[in-house]
Amino acid sequence: MHKTLPSSEYLVLSRGQWDEHLSPEEIQAAIDAFYAWHGRLVDEGRMRAGQRLAREGRRVSRQAVTDGPFGESKELIGGYWHVLARSLDEAAALMAQNPTLACGLSFEVRPIDPERASAWVASNETPPARS
């Protein structure tokens, strides 16, 4: 029997920092639980591998290249993953099972738009409609 895999891809951004009261042993236990959970979901075809992000970075704009990281420390993006799910709600429910949630991290789940960008189609990058 062929199992039907979810058809939409979602980007998950890991945000925040570990709770300050946690010991290194508690943090490592959460990390180990995460990798076991993540590995199982990759094996099931429900997640794809992602990566942690380094602390340093650059913001590139038309005015300048600025050293980073950016934003408040609680808002820093620490890593990313890809979730495969049938809906945004299903992807969010899957991330609600992430073992590191209980330790202070949070996750932003965003659909990946398969369409090519266009100046004539409203998106998060196009300016508001002109009157």
Would you name each region that the model predicts?
Residues 1-131:
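Conserved, structured core segments of small domains
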